[in-house]
Every structure is written in C-alpha cells, then in structure tokens.
Amino acid sequence: MSATKLTRREQRARAQHFIDTLEGTAFPNSKRIYLTGTHSGVRVPMREIQLSPTLIGGSKEQPQFEENEAIPVYDTSGPYGDPQIAINVQQGLAKLRQPWIDARGDTEELTVRSSDYTKARLADDGLDELRFSGVLTPKRAKAGRRVTQLHYARQGIITPEMEFIAIRENMGRERIRSEVLRHQHPGMSFGARLPENITAEFVRDEVAAGRAIIPANINHPESEPMIIGRNFLVKVNANIGNSAVTSSIEEEVEKLVWSMRWGADTVMDLSTGRYIHETREWILRNSPVPIGTVPIYQALEKVNGIAEDLTWEAFRDTLLEQAEQGVDYFTIHAGVLLRYVPMTAKRLTGIVSRGGSIMAKWCLSHHQENFLYQHFREICEICAAYDVSLSLGDGLRPGSIQDANDEAQFAELHTLGELTKIAWEYDVQVMIEGPGHVPMQMIRRNMTEELEHCHEAPFYTLGPLTTDIAPGYDHFTSGIGASMIGWFGCAMLCYVTPKEHLGLPNKEDVKQGLITYKIAAHAADLAKGHPGAQIRDNAMSKARFEFRWEDQFNLALDPFTARAYHDETLPQESGKVAHFCSMCGPKFCSMKISQEVRDYAATQTIEMGMADMSENFRARGGEIYLRKEEA
C-alpha cells in the first residue's frame, strides 16, 4: 500500500494519463489468437500462453528439448488485450455485433429519444466537454417484434452470438494434444449438465430453457458475446462506479479497462454521484463486456435522494434512458414486498441492500405495494424491446451470518421465482441475485432453494461471506463462500474487494477482488468437472516439477505478483533456472528430490532388467541363437 495518498486532482490526472496512453497489451509471453466460426464476423478472442521447452537429456553442449504446447485461456480483455489494435477511448470500440443485429431486420433506429431525461441532457450545452463525442443512434424493436436472445432461441434460431459463445466456452481445448495436459479428475456437478463439447445448439437449448442468459442489448454492439449459466464456466462480475464524494469519469473508464484486464466477465456501473448519464455513455462505448446497472440509484438522484418521492414515471424514464444507451442488464428489486418488510424487524442487521432499503422505505411511507412489482409487466415490455436482461435483486439478502437463510430472504426468493415466469412470458432473459452473508454449512440450501423456486434460472451471488470478523479481508471471507456456491451451481459471482464495508475500492482493490474471485470461479469449475478446466493446472504443475520458472510466472492468474514474490529472494537471472526456490533451498527441495528418485528408479529398472536378461541368457546355455521352438 502506498504511503502517499494522492489528491483528487492527482487521481484524475493519473486516470487521464492512463486513458491517453492506453494501448492493447498482452500478458507476459502471451499472444492474442482468434478462433473463427461459420457465421460471418465470428472471431473469438483468446489468450495463448507460450511455454518454453522441457530439457529431457543430451549434454551441456548439445542439450535435448521437448516442446511444450501453448495453453489457450479465456480472455475478457477485448481489444485491450490485442497489441495489434489501436485504442482510442475518445472514439470507442468497434461495433462487433452491429452487422448481426442489422441482418436480423427486426430493429429500427429512433429519431427521437424515448427518455425525457436524456433529451434534457443532450440539450444542455454545459455538458458538452463531458459528453462522449460519438453518441450512438439508439435502436429498438420494430412494432410487434421481440429482439431478445431468448426469443431467438425459442424460435430454434442459432444466432452468431450463440456460435461465438460455444467457441469461447470450449476455451480452445481442442488445440491441446498432450494426454498429460488433457487429464482431468471427474467432477461432482450436483445435477449440472456439462457436455464434453459445447456446441452452438447446446447454447441455444440452454438459453431457450431459461437456464442461461446472454446479456446483449442491441444498443451495445461493442460487446463480445458471453453466457451466464450453471452449465457453463462460472463467471465473475466487478462493480465500479462513482459516488457523490469520490471518483470521476476518467477514473471509472480506467477501472473498467483494469477490471477487464484482470478477468471481469461483466461490469456493473453503480454510480450514484454527478454525471451518471455521461459516465455510463463513456463506459458502454468502451466496454467489450456486458454492463449492468441498478436503475433505482439514478431514479433516486432524479428526485434529489428522497426515496418517498420516487414514482413509476421517473423509474420508467430511467429504464428507457439506460436501455437506449446500451445497458445489458438491470438489477430490479421487485421482490421487496410490503408484507415482507416487517419480517426483517428481528434481524441483527436489518435490510443491507441499498436498493432493497430504498424500496422498503417507499413501501412503508406510502403504505403501498412496491411499484416495481406492480409495474413488472411494463418493465418486461421495455426489456423485450432492447434485449435488456433482468437481474432480479435480492433486496432482503442477509447482511450478517446471524440473519442468513431467514424468513424474509426466502420469501423474497420465492417471489423472484414468480416474477421469472412473468418475464419469460415476454421472452425476457432473467437471472436471480443471491446473498450475502451465509456460514458454510448453510450455503448449499441457497442453491437448492433457488433452483427449485426460480425454475433453474441462473443464480448470481455476492460472495457469500462466510464470516463477519475480517474487515479488510472480506475478499477472502467471501471467496470461500463463492467457490462453494459456484461448485453447487451458481452461474456468476459478484466480486468483493478488500474495501467491502470500509470504503469505495480503488484500482488495486479492484484487482485484488478480481484475482480472488477468478480463483473461486476456477476452483468451482474444477470441482464441477467442466471439460478442459484442469488443462492450465496441469501445465502449471508440469512447469513447476521441471523448474521452468518463467512458465510458472506466465501461467499464473497474476504473472506480475508471482514473479515479484520469487524475485524478492532470488532476483538474479540464475534464479530463473535454479532447481529450487528460497522456501527449501537447493538441498531440501521436494521437487528436486522427487526428480532424483524418479531418475534413480528408472536407472535401477534398467539395470535390473539387464541383470534378468543376463541370467536368462546363461540359463539357456549361453547360445547366441536358439532353435525356433526354444525362442
């Protein structure tokens, strides 16, 4: 941690410099590759980690080597991970999906924005210097049409997005030939259906059944298609966003790019401060991953932060504003019903969800039912016109392990299941949000309840945190719960940073949270038995046993930290080829001793074999040639 705290001006200047000098960057000894599909324009990016050869014999002068295969890995960094692509944040990213959207012929450009708030912002000349220059002309579905990936899937249509996802989820494992690398332990999937090869038809079928979603607003053509579902790789979400007291547009764009570099599959913009609209436009136009929001936060800003003054009209205007900007999924707290609020009275920590507390306060002040619940069908109509997925928020999630799995939490969950079926009537894609704070022995029930009552819609959880005693380390406490619930079937994990419960995360906190959650997600994939999940582990273990230090660094989730820790004690170049590390030293390295034992055993086997053959030769009379019947 830096001893010098930057001023707000210095923080903004640093972020501006980051944006101005941004270019595509590969991880050490990695290169960007693209796998193509049958649909036009389907080029799926992956990162391929190049490995050094293994020394297998020979002499010092003429060593013999065996090549090691490059390892392809899932890559969320988009154009920012390709050194061949010129990055210009002022112009935004290329519109990858635009030709696919246009080819379907079911959308139309809007000549006038649907949101009054958007119209007012665009008419305000004072915002010109903050505004993203290349504002997208929004589209919506033509009258009587639905443009969601769920609608297409139910019609039996395999979209380019679905083919893109199938290639991406297979992670290029068909390129791996080594049996050592392909070896994998059987998983325990708890009912998940994990095919050996993921096809576009399998993707379509999972989306059609509601077991998976493809967040892909037609107004976010820059996004690279991805999928959230328990029969696919476990995904990780990162939260960013400014507040009334900290962060700027430049810093949020920097955090966006940083999040994707470290593995965020989606990013939620939780901004609550000034210039929410303008910040979101910059984020969307520069994001290759889906962007989610909590619209009630901005709606609250529009009524000066007074929850009692919220109206359906203000909220509806916010939905239209954000849908036409390109937001891919909305968190909607429509399950916080008036009759559930008293259930939280006996809790130790009450209602801890910001969105949940806003809606609870509105319900109590008006003594009326939650207007998000009352107008849920209208919400679905809006989402169906732009293909905005719904993330049904857990406004009554437990905020302490004492409150875990209580009456209020599961009452809301059951209501979310009812709302899921309504959303599906409109071909709107749905995932369900979950807790929270839950001790380990109570985690699995959350998954089984969700599968049963929410009809196997994808589950998306914040952790859960497994203990409440570690402020400053809640990325650890929640990472434990995240790996468990991911194994049980949770489709996406919302990261927790070291600043959870303490403050707004900075750039380094974002990285720490993401690395922790990429570990949790990968551990869950291994435990479920996701095909190919173990390849990278096998490659790392082989490199470790063969003392290929550079390969160990480069195969790591965080190559820079791995190298830095090694170099703290063995900084010399000779340390990169040494057959030991500073933990045990040269004489007590278990790997080195194991190699010596293996070599000794192999030599002994050869010598014993030769002795057996010699004895057999003498027993047969010492004749060089034997008669045919004796041979």
UniProtKB/Swiss-Prot annotation:
Q: In which pathway does it act?
A: Cofactor biosynthesis; thiamine diphosphate biosynthesis
List cystine links.
Answer: none
Domain of life assignment: Bacteria
For this protein, the record's NCBIfam families field holds: PRK09284.1, PRK13352.1, thiC
| Organism name | Shigella boydii serotype 18 (strain CDC 3083-94 / BS512)
Query: What function is annotated for this protein?
Result: Catalyzes the synthesis of the hydroxymethylpyrimidine phosphate (HMP-P) moiety of thiamine from aminoimidazole ribotide (AIR) in a radical S-adenosyl-L-methionine (SAM)-dependent reaction.
- The protein's Enzyme Commission number: 4.1.99.17
Q: What are the GO MF terms of this UniProt record?
A: 4 iron, 4 sulfur cluster binding; carbon-carbon lyase activity; zinc ion binding
Taxonomic lineage: Bacteria, Pseudomonadati, Pseudomonadota, Gammaproteobacteria, Enterobacterales
Q: What is this protein called?
A: Phosphomethylpyrimidine synthase
